[in-house]
């Protein structure tokens, strides 16, 4: 009998694991770009495979969502946003509408606790309710000036079928005082489904927010609409920035009686017709292929993060980390007392070093990954001098007493073994320091090829990288070459790739020999001069 119980227990665990990501096997339909792949953003993705109701919200819900609007607004028209109308049944999210009396309705809503920002793909699988109410999956900025409507559907259309057969795919730009609203108009914003009401089946609704001036809309994996610069903000409500701010995700239903017919109290009381069902939501960001974007699966071997604000520029191929990025698959374990700044691009600062995360407190950055040995590169610096910055990994001190002058950016790296599926990086300040300040975290799995190559060149994995590493591009320069100081005239410089293959050989004609990087792909290389080797990172 005990064996039977154990078997049932393991079957239960297996089923729970299988259900953890209901979208497994469904490819992201948008193109992430050349050399890029999709990486799941777990802190805003959810299969809703848990039970949740008002007064009984598990961590699986509260870590990602709140059952209310971004502020105290209670909704448009006859809507009353109300927490009990947002619940889960163990496999789906229910966004319900119920009678509130006096012609009004209680309406379910959830808002993400974590923000997203372009480039990002977001998608839900959902079935809209059979009501005149709006069912919506959308995003909104804190200042309520930028809105993206991934989908807004009306399940029934009293007196006709026009709205029931069309899905609204749109966006808004606002001026709040005096209130001014722009959204694109015309048939292109209403996708027609061949005469079949959208309420009749589950559909996948997605949008690739590619950049501030490009939106791509997808339904059931097919691109159905593209919005470009001319339609984003023609009235210049946003001052030329486009849709550039970090934003919250919202899933809700609304009784939009300011322009739509009202649902009757009898209609609202019909539980067979008053629920907007959401099977899952998934969100992805494009990352460099070398970064091993996991598309929702395990196995990523490289993770590149550009630390800054919610709106500052991000280096191509990197993923944004701001002071509000909470640990899901990656992020800060505690965001309290972490600051962020964008110092701008003056004095030659590039998009890696112009923006920072900083704190006077000890804080942990965590990354989920497979077990193994990883090389971690961290870039320190700011426009102000910083002293005695320290980093520990997996409980072991790795970098100590890192100092940078004002405007100086220094990269240091180390290797660390991970055996619990999560890398923990601890950032702190020692005596005499005020804050730690970092611009980049780059985590790369150490392969047998790279380890063997280092050994062959007289280096070990424990050698201090600060004396043996170049970083390109230089924080203050963008020329397509790297300079090797103290070169011996008449000798040769040999550059190997990470597989140990020779990719370039240069005869030294100057004590500060310049090497052109034209044609070099992104990645890690090794420069050998007179038997001494150093890493060269091209990004």
UniProtKB/Swiss-Prot annotation:
Matches recorded under SUPFAM superfamilies: Concanavalin A-like lectins/glucanases, Galactose-binding domain-like
Subunit (UniProt): Monomer.
Region (Disordered): 332-353
Lineage of source species: Bacteria, Pseudomonadati, Bacteroidota, Flavobacteriia, Flavobacteriales
Entry keyword annotation includes Hydrolase: yes
Protein name: Beta-agarase A
A Pfam family this chain is assigned to: Por_Secre_tail
Compartments in which it is found: Secreted
Species per Swiss-Prot/TrEMBL record: Zobellia galactanivorans (strain DSM 12802 / CCUG 47099 / CIP 106680 / NCIMB 13871 / Dsij)
GO molecular function annotations of the record: beta-agarase activity
Domain of life: Bacteria
Assigned protein family: Belongs to the glycosyl hydrolase 16 family.
UniProt keyword terms in alphabetical order: Glycosidase, Hydrolase, Secreted, Signal
Protein's gene: agaA
UniProt domain GH16: residue ranges: 21-289
Entry comment on modification after translation: Proteolytically cleaved into mature beta-agarase A catalytic chain (AgaAc).
GO BP: carbohydrate metabolic process
Range of residues in the leader sequence: 1-19
């Amino acid at each position: 009998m005990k064996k039977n119980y154990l078997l049932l227990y393991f079957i239960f665990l297996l089923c729970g694991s299988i259900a953890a990501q209901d979208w497994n096997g469904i490819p992201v339909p948008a193109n992430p770009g050349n050399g890029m792949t999709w990486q799941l953003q777990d802190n805003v993705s959810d299969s809703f495979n848990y039970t949740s109701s008002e007064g009984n919200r598990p961590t699986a819900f509260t870590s990602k969502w709140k059952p209310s609007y971004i502020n105290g607004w209670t909704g448009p028209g006859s809507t009353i946003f109300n927490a009990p109308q947002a619940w889960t049944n163990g496999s789906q999210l229910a966004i319900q509408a119920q009678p509130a009396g006096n012609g009004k309705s209680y309406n379910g809503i959830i808002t993400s606790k974590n923000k997203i920002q372009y480039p990002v793909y977001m998608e839900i699988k959902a079935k809209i309710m059979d009501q005149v109410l709006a069912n919506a999956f959308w995003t909104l900025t804190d200042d309520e000036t930028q809105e993206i409507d991934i989908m807004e559907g009306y399940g029934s259309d009293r007196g006709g079928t026009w709205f029931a057969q069309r899905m609204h795919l749109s966006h808004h730009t606002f001026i709040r005082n005096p209130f001014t609203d722009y959204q694109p108009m015309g048939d292109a914003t209403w996708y027609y489904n061949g005469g079949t009401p959208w309420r009749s089946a589950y559909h996948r609704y997605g949008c690739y927010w590619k950049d501030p001036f490009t939106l791509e809309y997808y339904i059931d994996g097919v691109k159905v609409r593209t919005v470009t610069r001319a339609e984003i903000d023609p009235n210049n409500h946003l001052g030329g920035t486009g849709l550039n701010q970090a934003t919250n995700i919202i899933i809700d239903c609304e009784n939009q009686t300011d322009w739509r017919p009202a649902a009757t109290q009898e209609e609202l009381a019909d539980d067979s017709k008053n629920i907007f069902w959401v099977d899952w939501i998934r969100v992805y960001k494009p990352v460099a292929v070398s970064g091993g974007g996991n598309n929702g699966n395990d196995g990523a071997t490289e993770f590149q993060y550009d630390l800054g604000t919610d709106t500052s520029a991000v280096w191509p191929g990197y993923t944004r980390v701001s002071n509000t990025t909470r640990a899901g698959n990656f992020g800060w374990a505690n965001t309290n007392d972490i600051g962020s700044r964008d110092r701008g691009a003056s004095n030659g600062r590039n998009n890696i070093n112009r923006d920072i995360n900083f704190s006077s407190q000890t804080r942990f950055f965590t990354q989920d990954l497979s077990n193994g040995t990883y090389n971690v590169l961290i870039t320190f610096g700011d426009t102000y001098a910083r002293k005695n910055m320290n980093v520990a990994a997996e409980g072991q001190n790795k970098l100590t007493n890192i100092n940078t002058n004002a405007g100086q950016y220094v990269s240091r790296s180390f290797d660390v073994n991970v055996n619990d599926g999560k890398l923990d990086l601890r950032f702190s300040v020692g005596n005499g320091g005020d804050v730690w300040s970092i611009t980049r975290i780059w985590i790369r799995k150490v392969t047998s090829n790279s380890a063997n190559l280092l050994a062959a060149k007289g280096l070990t994995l424990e050698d201090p990288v600060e004396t043996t590493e170049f970083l390109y591009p230089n924080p203050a320069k963008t020329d397509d070459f790297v300079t090797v100081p103290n070169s011996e005239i008449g000798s040769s410089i040999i550059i190997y790739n990470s597989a140990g293959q020779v990719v370039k050989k240069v005869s030294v004609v100057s004590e500060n020999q310049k090497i052109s990087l034209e044609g070099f792909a992104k990645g890690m290389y090794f420069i050998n001069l007179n038997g001494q080797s150093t890493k060269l990172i091209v990004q």
